[in-house]
Amino acid sequence: MKKRIVLCLAMAGIFPAVQAQTVVIDSQVTLAEALAGSSAPQEVLDSLAIADVEYYSFDGKLHRGQIVMHKTLKEDVIHRFRFMRNQRFPIESAIPIRFDKPNDGTSMDTLNNSYSFHYRRISTSGNGSRSVHSYGMAIDINPYNNPAVLANGKVIPQGGTYDRDIPGTLADTSPVVKEFIRLGWTWGGNWTSLKDYMHFEKKLP
């Protein structure tokens, strides 16, 4: 009888049937706030969107962050994060990078932060060309766990360690990697000239 009363109260909205899970907020800004001060051309800024994403972080708690990406990839990115959340694949944080600087000494190094849009040059190349991150068409996941390893042995970010046995690390056997590839993304861990384990990119349709 007691269970039946509780169920009726829950259905009436008087007594919660299941206590809502507390979500840790890592980022909660508008697109304008995320892009404030960027040196990107206006046509690039106009092509971007922001998405709220949820993920389990390394503390085991559910977090909510944000990703700025090209607007045509918004639903793709939301789906990818939903997949990682359901897989309990840990993400350190997802906070928009709100300044234009090289990777060294910024979000990648200090926060192990996952992100998409970042108006910058390619950090793994010396030719000075723009990264696809400059257009929000790539996403980096847990850079410390999934660093870029150049042909000369240099690791970016400095201090990053690639160990497949550590949670939050991407590998060719990872369901996360397989899901990205299934939906048309290219993974930097499959490159031959260098290994960029954190990196996924996708050409626009």
List the predicted regions and their residue ranges:
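Boundary at the C-terminal end of the N-terminal hydrophobic targeting segment
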Residues: 18-20
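Cell-envelope/glycan interface and biosynthesis
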Residues: 22-190
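Residues in and immediately flanking transmembrane alpha helices
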Residues: 15-16, 146
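Sec-dependent N-terminal signal peptides
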Residues: 4-14
